[in-house]
């Protein structure tokens, strides 16, 4: 029949993230074990990145003249999230600031992430609320790990303005065709994209997977990444670069009591 069956798995206690997305029993999300059951940063699934993406210069954010240590990709992926609601419109999880998060990031906030399964599409929204008494700077993004048979089998269809391996300095214009290849002797490979015209898509001729990442205008950056001989490729929508929160005019700022919602989606197909 033409009716496909899909399942979306969310693990609130592991960073409030997607940990599985299957189509007719075929898994599209890659899981790293034993990392799944450890308490360190999840390097699998679909981590939520907040209040920053990547690693800021010196591993710190500077707020009001004081340096605050920051984990790679922020801390939302290290926290257990609370289940706010479960219903026909999907699952909503919440993460609120605590004394521990304020040690890293001196702001009061609530994050709400909603996951909704629409056939073979997972629709995801993130609402950031400033609950404090001062303007709140941040960036956000997601770090999805998708199953891949082998890097050389993965063919990307992406339109963007620039493409490089380092976000610092002048960014070279993107080639006509975006590719992700490994340099001799390197253990990983990365592409940092700006001016992305979503959706980003890849097709894997080895496992027959086609994955589409679409995103609203709050995202204009993309990251492609692959490491070791692992069977995954990351195709990630980002709102900021590693040091954006430290750089004037390069991050989001919410005024007191303001909120912002961003939306994106993952669509999985068999080809």
Describe each region flagged by the PLM.
Residues 2-5:
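Short, small-residue-biased leader/transition segments that mark boundaries at the very start
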Residues 9-66, 234:
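Acidic-aromatic substrate-binding/catalytic surfaces of carbohydrate-active enzymes
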Residues 10, 126-132, 226-227, 268:
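Asparagine-centered strand-capping/turn motif at beta-strand->loop junctions
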Residues 61-69, 253-270:
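Short Pro-Gly-centered flexible turn/kink motifs
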Residues 66-119:
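Extended, loop-rich substrate-binding clefts of extracytoplasmic carbohydrate-active enzymes
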Residues 112-114, 189-190, 249-254:
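Beta-strand-rich interaction surfaces with strong enrichment in secreted/lumenal proteins
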Residues 135-137, 144-217:
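Active-site/ligand-binding surface loops and adjacent short beta/alpha elements
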Residues 204-242:
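Glycine-rich active-site loops that engage anionic ligands at enzyme catalytic sites
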């Amino acid at each position: 029949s033409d009716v496909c069956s899909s399942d979306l798995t969310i693990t609130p206690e592991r960073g409030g993230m997607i940990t599985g997305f299957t189509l007719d029993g075929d898994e599209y999300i890659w899981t790293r074990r034993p990392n799944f059951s450890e308490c360190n940063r999840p390097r699998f699934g679909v981590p939520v990145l907040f209040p920053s993406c990547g690693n800021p210069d010196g591993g710190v954010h500077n707020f009001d003249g004081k340096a605050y240590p920051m984990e790679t990709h922020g801390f939302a992926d290290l926290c257990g999230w609370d289940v706010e609601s479960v219903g026909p419109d999907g699952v909503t999880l919440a993460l609120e600031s605590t004394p521990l998060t304020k040690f890293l990031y001196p702001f009061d906030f609530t994050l709400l992430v909603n996951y909704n399964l629409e056939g073979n599409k997972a629709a995801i929204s993130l609402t950031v609320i400033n609950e404090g008494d001062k303007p709140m700077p941040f960036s956000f993004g997601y770090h999805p790990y998708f199953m891949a048979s082998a890097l050389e089998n993965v063919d990307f269809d992406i339109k963007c303005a620039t493409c490089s391996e380092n976000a610092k300095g002048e960014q070279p214009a993107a080639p006509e065709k975006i590719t992700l290849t490994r340099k001799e002797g390197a253990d990983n490979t990365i592409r940092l994209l700006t001016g992305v015209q979503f959706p980003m898509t890849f097709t894997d001729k080895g496992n027959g997977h086609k994955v589409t990442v679409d995103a609203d205008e709050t995202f204009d950056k993309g990251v492609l990444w692959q490491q070791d001989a692992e069977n995954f490729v990351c195709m990630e929508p980002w709102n900021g670069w590693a040091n954006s929160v430290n750089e004037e005019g390069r991050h989001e700022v919410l005024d007191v009591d303001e909120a912002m919602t961003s939306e994106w989606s993952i669509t999985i197909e068999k080809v």
